Regions:
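C-terminal alpha-helix
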Residues: 77-85
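Extracytoplasmic/secreted proteins, especially bacterial periplasmic and envelope-associated proteins
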Residues: 70-77
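Catalytic beta-strand/loop cores that center a nucleophilic Ser/Cys/Thr
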Residues: 1-51
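Active-site rim elements
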Residues: 61-68
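Active-site-proximal beta-strand/loop segments in catalytic clefts of secreted hydrolases
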Residues: 24-26, 57-61
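Long alpha-helical segments found as membrane-embedded helices
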Residues: 52, 86-89
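Surface-exposed, flexible loop/turn segments at secondary-structure boundaries
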Residues: 29, 62, 86
């Protein structure tokens, strides 16, 4: 889905080697304020090495995202997954 008017962080190192990436963005689709380019730019991931379930969203600064059904669905699904009791047993 398209994300308009949001802030994109640039990493010095790609986090992909340490996490399980759920979504990424095409760096050619936006303009950065830095010369650092990763090519593959993860924006949503989980980190299975942690004890607690976690989902990291690199974007979500714009309130417009909460009007986007695809983003809302992904956000709700991530909350449901992190809060599931049956995964603790």
């Amino acid at each position: 889905f398209v994300v308009k008017d949001d802030e994109w962080y640039t990493y010095e190192q790609n986090p992909r080697q340490n996490v399980h990436v759920l979504a990424h963005v095409d760096e050619a689709s936006y303009t950065t304020k830095t010369d650092i380019k990763m090519g593959d730019h993860p924006v949503v991931w989980v980190n299975p090495s942690k004890t607690a379930r976690n989902v990291y969203f690199q974007f979500g600064h714009s309130k417009l995202l909460f009007q986007n059904p695809a983003f809302i669905g992904m956000f709700e699904n991530s909350l449901s997954w992190t809060l599931r009791d049956d995964l603790l047993r």
